[in-house]
Amino acid sequence: MSNIYIQEPPTNGKVLLKTSAGDIDIELWSKETPKACRNFVQLCMEGYYDGTIFHRMVPEFIVQGGDPTGTGTGGESIYGRPFKDEFHSRLRFNRRGLVAMANAGPHDNGSQFFFTLGRADELNNKHTIFGKVTGDTVYNMLRLADVACDGDERPLNPHKIRSTEVLHSPFDDIIPREIKGKKEKNKDEAKKSQSKATKNFSLLSFGEEAEEDEEMVNQVSQTMKGKSKSSHDLLKDDPKLSSVPVVDRNQGEGDFEDSDDDEDDAEDDSDREAEKAKVRENIAKKLKKDKTDEEKSSQDLVKKTSRSDELRKEARQLKKELLAIKQRKEDGVKKEEDVSEVGDSKQNSEAVTEYLESRKKYDDMRKQKLKKGSGREAQTLALLESFKSKLSSAISETPSAPEEDVEELAEDDDKGWMAHVLHFDEQSRKVKDANMQDEDTFEIYDPRNPVNKRRREESKKLLKDKKARR
């Protein structure tokens, strides 16, 4: 494991993610992947990842986040468009704790990123590795995977990124956009101020008159608040207006109320009866429709069942026919095999009977044998004595005949070999000279042999003489 860290290049830059699972320290490879690191650092400065969830989790593979929509299809880069992949020969998906850009294809990087939970060689040269998780925060990163997921790899209770903090920025020229500030301004503008506006009448040339009119209007509005306004209320000093009301309010209200109540009761009764009749008609229509639908469905079921029964019967008949055809074929093959077996049995019957008889004979002999012990030893000695007597009787019974006749008897009779005498040619015991060349001698070359030494010395002398003559 140590050689893996030696192969990785040094980091430059550090970011802290504060998540619901704990803090996660990320060190960046800003020299090897400058575009991806600049994008990640600026988005963290702008608070782009604040409140986003880790929307995808594959056990022992990856945990993915960085999408503000939480769907897995959103997110934009700081460049306004997807930026290119950045691969490096010393950055490989060979362990857990690596941070890489998520994409939907080549050169399609936005704001989404993922953490690796193990070795993932199949992602090499497909996703840009721009950082790694350091220290004990790796265990907080692993806690992101301790959630239950549905069939689409979405966590049921996903973890969130609460806030981000850039501890060391490798890029001094980054100017964060005011995305977070704009949101706060919009919220403040949405809240309406409840403080009342004050009018400064001293700025007007007719300020005193306007101020008096304003006071009169305020008094009238307060007195007539919640009431209908008429000329009797506003123009109290007008002599043309009579002080006697045209209609008595109490009397008029009582008459109107009685007549209105009677009319309303009659209208309500008629409306209720009409509504009841409509409801009854609708219920009757629905019942008729339900009955017709049930009848149609029952007829369809009967038709379907009858059709299915017919198909089943046809299938059964076809199966029976196929089985009968197979049985006929098997019977014909069996008959042929029986005929061939009968012919073979006639030929092999004699050999089989002999084999069975001999096997039975040896089985009986094996049964007669005793087990290990004193009885077994006595039996073997008895067998040895019987063999000796048989051998001596065979030698005494055989007549003196020439050797050729003895060999013929040994071949014909099973006991002839007992009277056979071993004869072999006598080999000559003459001593052979090693220096004599004969067909039976072997050529032996040994440099230590005195004969070979003399030959070498003689050949050396001949060579010296030839050189001296020249």
Curated annotation (Swiss-Prot):
As part of the spliceosome, plays a role in pre-mRNA splicing. Probable inactive PPIase with no peptidyl-prolyl cis-trans isomerase activity. Residues 11-166 form the PPIase cyclophilin-type domain. One of its GO terms (cellular component) is catalytic step 2 spliceosome. The keyword Iron does not apply. Belongs to the cyclophilin-type PPIase family. Residues 254-272 have a biased composition (Acidic residues). This is Spliceosome-associated protein CWC27 homolog. Residues 172-192, 230-240, 273-337, 356-367 have a biased composition (Basic and acidic residues). The gene is cwc27. One of its GO terms (molecular function) is peptidyl-prolyl cis-trans isomerase activity. Residues 281-332 form a coiled coil. Residues 172-377, 428-470 are annotated as: Disordered. InterPro entries: Cyclophilin-like_dom_sf (IPR029000), Cyclophilin-type_PPIase_CS (IPR020892), Cyclophilin-type_PPIase_dom (IPR002130), Cyclophilin_A-like (IPR044666). It comes from the Eukaryota. SUPFAM superfamilies: Cyclophilin-like. Keywords: Coiled coil, Nucleus. Part of the activated spliceosome B/catalytic step 1 spliceosome, one of the forms of the spliceosome which has a well-formed active site but still cannot catalyze the branching reaction and is composed at least of 52 proteins, the U2, U5 and U6 snRNAs and the pre-mRNA. Recruited during early steps of activated spliceosome B maturation, it is probably one of the first proteins released from this complex as he matures to the spliceosome C complex. Component of the minor spliceosome, which splices U12-type introns. Signal peptide: none annotated. GO terms for biological process: protein folding. It is found in: Nucleus.
